[in-house]
């Protein structure tokens, strides 16, 4: 279950369906990813074809995971037990 968001636009999209804070073209894929993230209990639940799940590296990124939305855009998250926390939507390359 998703507990917390880092990206306000992504939270509004998840809660209300508003695309104001995200790339509108990414909405269908983000919706599928957020549904799956809300239902899964571990990172491997996000390991679907084309999503390119991987653990992030770096001192400050230990415990974070990323899936590819489109191009450079990623959905990143950490897990606290079986809950997703600090869910973010970012162009990080």
Q: What are the roles of these predicted feature ranges?
A:
Residues 1, 9, 18, 42, ...:
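Glycine-rich, flexible loop/turn motifs
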Residues 1-33:
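Arg/Lys-rich, positively charged N-terminal/basic patches that mediate binding to nucleic acids
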Residues 8, 12, 29, 44, ...:
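A broad, structure-centric signal for solvent-exposed, well-ordered loop/edge residues
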Residues 23-50:
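Short, solvent-exposed, low-complexity loop/linker segments
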Residues 41-65:
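A short, surface-exposed loop/turn module that caps and links secondary-structure elements
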Residues 56, 60, 65-93:
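Enriched for short, Lys/Arg-rich terminal
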């Amino acid at each position: 279950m998703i507990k917390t968001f880092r990206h306000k636009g992504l939270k509004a999209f998840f809660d209300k369906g508003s695309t104001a804070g995200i790339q509108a073209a990414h909405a269908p894929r983000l919706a599928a990813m957020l549904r799956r993230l809300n239902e899964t209990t571990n990172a491997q639940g996000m390991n679907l074809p084309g999503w390119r799940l991987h653990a992030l590296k770096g001192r400050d990124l230990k415990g974070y995971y990323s899936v590819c939305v489109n191009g450079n855009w990623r959905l990143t998250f950490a897990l606290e037990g079986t809950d997703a926390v600090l869910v973010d939507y970012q162009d990080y390359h």
